[in-house]
């Protein structure tokens, strides 16, 4: 490349240029609504490294976002690709990781728990895959997003939600939307029985007042808290499902969980359908990200494979 880019931290002032860059560099993602969340938003581990590569005239050419050892995103404007900018940004992320955690830490691409744009490199992004392979990264796993039809789907209707809720009630359970008062019981239940990072996402889904970064996604969602819960006869929360805890505003579903001793009562289905009805009109409404139980989602909502991703890690 002729001129080495100037590297500096991304600031709120840079977000419009970053949104334009990401929309062109990452064609398979809806990036504009979540650019602030991805670049300046909080992470589960409370750390953040977000750097831009700028031309001498101040044009944003590329951006890298790192959280811990996870490379959340690396993007270069198409007009500036194949000039070494991506490599420079990757090297800056590597240097930051080495300085902060030690040389033995390995960069991992995409699947950052809690705040991720996508859980890996889209399988269709062949150039991106080649870029990482050429720089010593190897494939470690492939992951899947599903998408449930949210319109004209007999499995996703208010009538079906009422039926599922009624069945749960007959078994002694109450299914409802969560409130801010549920925040601490949810945190205790999730951290005690599921992945602690899920509590971070659920807190974000409950509402801006529970997020540590006051500038991030400051507006409430139209439906209110984006979490649905099931309570047993004692009033204890025994199941939950959330959406918009990650990629807020796009309508991504997850996480969800039911305590083992309360499974088999249709609670998960009721909570899933409640969430899918919430997100019917979002840009990515119906996306079920980073899926484990494919069969459950297929049976409960008619979800089908949508996108596949490759997760890379340094050798």
What is the predicted role of each segment?
Residues 1-38, 52-54, 59-60, 143, ...:
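Short amphipathic alpha-helix that is part of the acyltransferase structural core
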Residues 70-83, 112-115, 256-264:
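A short, internal acetyl-CoA/4′-phosphopantetheine-binding micro-motif in the GNAT/acyltransferase core
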Residues 1, 90-169, 310-315:
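Acyl-donor-binding surface of acyltransferase catalytic domains
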Residues 263-315:
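Short hairpin/turn module used for nucleic-acid contact or packing/dimerization
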Residues 71, 106-110, 119, 253, ...:
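Conserved hydrophobic beta-strand within the GNAT/NAT acetyltransferase core sheet
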Residues 82-98, 258, 264-277, 299:
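Conserved acetyl-CoA-binding loop-helix of GNAT-fold acetyltransferases
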Residues 62, 141-144, 238-239, 307:
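A structural microfeature
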Residues 23, 29-50, 62-70, 194-258:
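A conserved beta-strand-loop-helix scaffold within acyl/acetyltransferase catalytic domains
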